[in-house]
């Protein structure tokens, strides 16, 4: 069996990710092309899809020989995994908020939270399209279906962590940095465990859709109602997540194979330093500093 050049693999994945990151940064300028909100959203959504899927398709051809696809497997106890996933992401979001809050209070960083507003049902539908449908589908196809899958030859743990870091830095927002990393880890685990991108898309869509619902309630009813719903649902996710994790640990004591991941590591070596990974990280950090720090 041919040994994998893992440095080349890393550089190839990070090069494609860097291209996506640069293309996405052009979106704010494209928004200036028209004042029509519907046309603007359609342009942004189209460019967003192209910016992620076109480089991914090119990457598939570039490193196609290194392909390793996880074996498809049924997701047992789906509600258990649902609460673990949403509980983890919710906990990470609160941690992220607590980390950023003192920095914002001290004036070190600007307001890093993205708070869209809607004034009609039409706006809600556009927000659903631009937040709860297109990003979950395109981002999961790219970050799990391409980045994570292509990194599997270096080992599950490294592949999950690196792909989650790429996913987190891609968003370029301090207000999302920690919880998008946690989400990337969760979605990555689910992808390798099930061998399917569909559960990842559904979880991602649920998370983003929940934010859309909170935004709509905040706009059409009151901030108090939105806050009450947010705290209630977050509490359910957190409690359900901890309870589900406890049940998972009990199941693992009886059956060590429950929830275990198959290993897809291949033989290979790092022949040089993955410089493109450093360039991607530097570009992403520069964007975060430029966007968030006052």
Per-range role (PLM):
Residues 21-61, 229-240:
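Alpha-helical transmembrane segments in multi-pass membrane proteins
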Residues 6, 36-39, 122, 225-229:
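Membrane-interfacial loop-to-transmembrane-helix junctions in polytopic alpha-helical membrane proteins
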Residues 29, 33-36, 60-68, 97, ...:
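Transmembrane helix-loop junctions in multipass membrane proteins, especially transporters and channels
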Residues 23-31, 54-59, 88-99, 103, ...:
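Alpha-helical membrane-inserting segments
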Residues 124-293:
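Transmembrane helix-loop-helix hairpins at the membrane interface
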Residues 35-40, 67-138, 152, 289-294:
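Juxtamembrane helix-loop-helix connectors linking adjacent transmembrane helices
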Residues 2-19, 46, 63-95, 259-284:
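Interfacial transmembrane-helix boundary/kink motif in multi-pass membrane proteins
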Residues 14-25, 45-53, 81-94, 128, ...:
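Alpha-helical transmembrane spans of integral membrane proteins, capturing the lipid-embedded, hydrophobic core
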């Amino acid at each position: 069996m041919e040994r994998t050049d893992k440095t080349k693999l890393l550089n190839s994945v990070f090069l494609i990710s860097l291209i996506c990151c640069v293309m996405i940064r052009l979106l704010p300028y494209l928004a200036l092309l028209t004042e029509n909100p519907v046309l603007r959203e359609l342009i942004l959504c189209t460019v967003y899809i192209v910016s992620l899927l076109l480089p991914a398709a090119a990457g598939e051809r570039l490193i196609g020989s290194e392909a390793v696809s996880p074996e498809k497997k049924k997701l047992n106890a789906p509600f258990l995994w649902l609460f673990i996933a949403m509980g983890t992401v919710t906990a990470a979001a609160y941690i992220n908020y607590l980390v950023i809050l003192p920095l914002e209070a001290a004036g070190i960083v600007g307001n890093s939270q993205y708070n869209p507003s809607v004034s009609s049902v039409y706006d809600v539908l556009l927000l659903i399209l631009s937040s709860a449908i297109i990003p979950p589908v395109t981002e999961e196809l790219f970050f799990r279906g391409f980045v994570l899958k292509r990194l599997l030859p270096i080992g599950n743990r490294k592949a999950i962590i690196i792909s989650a870091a790429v996913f987190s830095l891609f968003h370029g927002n301090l207000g999302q940095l920690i919880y998008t990393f946690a989400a990337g880890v969760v979605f990555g685990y689910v992808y390798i465990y099930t061998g399917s991108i569909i559960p990842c898309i559904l979880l991602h869509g649920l998370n983003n859709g929940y934010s859309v619902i909170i935004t709509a309630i905040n706009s059409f009813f009151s901030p108090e109602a939105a806050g009450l719903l947010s705290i209630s649902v977050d509490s359910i996710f957190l409690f359900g997540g901890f309870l589900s994790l406890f049940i998972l640990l009990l199941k693992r004591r009886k059956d060590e194979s429950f929830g275990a991941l198959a290993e897809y590591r291949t033989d290979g070596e790092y022949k040089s330093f993955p410089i493109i990974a450093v360039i991607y990280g530097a570009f992403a950090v520069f964007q975060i500093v430029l966007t968030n720090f006052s």
